[in-house]
Swiss-Prot record:
Keyword Oxidoreductase: yes
Keyword Amino-acid biosynthesis carried by entry: yes
Catalysis: reaction(s): N-acetyl-L-glutamate 5-semialdehyde + phosphate + NADP(+) = N-acetyl-L-glutamyl 5-phosphate + NADPH + H(+)
An example Gene Ontology molecular-function term: NAD binding
Function of the protein: Catalyzes the NADPH-dependent reduction of N-acetyl-5-glutamyl phosphate to yield N-acetyl-L-glutamate 5-semialdehyde.
Full protein name: N-acetyl-gamma-glutamyl-phosphate reductase
Gene from which this protein is expressed: argC
Subcellular location(s) per record: Cytoplasm
SMART domains (UniProt xref): Semialdhyde_dh
InterPro entries assigned to the protein according to its UniProt record, in alphabetical order: AGPR_AS, AGPR_type-1, NAD(P)-bd_dom_sf, NAGSA_dehydrogenase, Semialdehyde_DH_NAD-bd
Residues the record marks as active site: C147
GO cellular component term, pick one: cytoplasm
Length: 343
């Protein structure tokens, strides 16, 4: 299969290149950038010297359609809604890593992203690509989930799908490494601001909230809202999500663990920790795994769920490739069979 990557110079695009180089059934046909053309990526990223020689090209839809079977779009939100349309219309596989096609309600997108939404008919066509819970495995136009949304939804799914929790009780405390803010530097991602520091940001206003709610209410329509906070922590990669919920009825630690084990029994990239152990960000670094730990406090009737992912892999490029593997009927782990980098 021939693939093109639009937005190849961003962190998501770079991860796509790294992972696709290990894929047995995929060749990278073309690489595209808005900011640089006619140069190789190694000119900007020396770690790719001798590994990726394809020149960066301007975006020419006719040429991309001619040379490619699949197009990955790894641009910031607000760009893909226009860039993706020719490839969708041409019948290519399209996987969008931005948030432009995740929300079915265009007014919600414009409220939370502050940008004009994609056309409604394209929003209707997009399949939300939470890989472990795809509705249509044959869909060829995928809205890849956000990193916070992925960690949160995988953490909550076993309980919410069976409607076992008090729908008003969901509290999510999510923390991200600095790469989650993207490649373009800002005051909040400056070394002197992030080193030895932790910063709460977008309190009650993060754009992944409606995406999470959209999926949760598909599983349990009675959920009215979630309390969701996000923080930047001084690491390069990783999402560390701590989720608190109250079960409708008391549950034992063993029952809780068995529920998660059975839900994810056939999920290649979700690993449930042994009872009374909890995951760390480092154990999933540079991998497509989501690791989950669980606890139940009988005194407070509160379940604590700890869900960790690498924001650039399971939270972006890795899940995008997992979605490609599902739609193309490749082995789900092709291009993703990495042991996490440790220490």
């Amino acid at each position: 299969m021939k693939v093109s990557i639009i937005g190849a110079t961003g962190y998501g695009g770079l991860e796509l290149i790294r992972l696709l180089h290990q894929h047995s059934s995929v060749d990278i046909a073309t690489l595209h950038s808005f900011s640089a053309q006619s140069e190789t990526l190694a000119n900007f990223y020396p770690h790719l010297k001798g590994l990726e020689a394809s020149p960066l090209e301007k975006i020419n839809p006719a040429e991309i359609i001619e040379k490619s079977d699949t197009v990955f779009i790894a641009t910031p939100s607000g760009i893909a809604k226009d860039v993706a349309l020719p490839y969708i219309d041409a019948g290519l596989n399209v996987i969008d890593l931005s948030g432009d096609f995740r929300l079915k309600d265009n007014q919600l997108y414009e409220k939370w992203y502050g940008k004009k939404a994609a056309p409604e008919d394209y929003l209707a066509k997009a399949e939300y690509g939470l890989a472990e819970f795809r509705d249509n495995e044959l869909a060829t136009f995928i809205a890849n989930p956000g990193c916070y949304a992925t960690a949160t939804l995988l953490g909550l799914a076993p309980l919410v799908k069976k409607q076992l929790i008090d729908p008003t009780s969901i509290i999510v405390d999510a923390k991200s490494g600095i790469s989650g803010a993207g490649k373009v530097p800002s005051k909040s991602t400056h070394f002197t601001e992030t080193n030895e520091n932790m910063t709460l940001y977008k309190m009650n206003s993060h754009q992944h909230i409606p995406e999470i709610m959209q999926q949760l209410t598909k599983w349990d329509k009675s959920i009215p809202a979630i309390q969701f906070s996000t923080s930047l922590i001084p690491i390069t990669r990783g999402i560390f999500t701590t989720i608190y919920v109250k079960p409708k009825n008391p549950i034992t630690q063993q029952e809780l663990h068995q529920l998660y084990e059975s839900t994810y029994e056939h999920a290649s990239f979700v690993r449930i920790q042994a009872e009374n152990t909890y995951p760390t960000v480092k154990q999933v670094t540079a991998s497509n795994y989501c690791d989950i730990g669980l606890a139940y406090n009988e005194k407070t009737n509160v379940i604590t769920i700890v869900s960790v992912i690498d924001n650039l892999v399971k939270g972006a490029a890795g899940q995008a490739i997992q979605n490609l593997n599902i739609m193309a009927n490749f082995a789900e782990s092709d291009g993703l069979g990495f042991i996490p980098v440790y220490p």
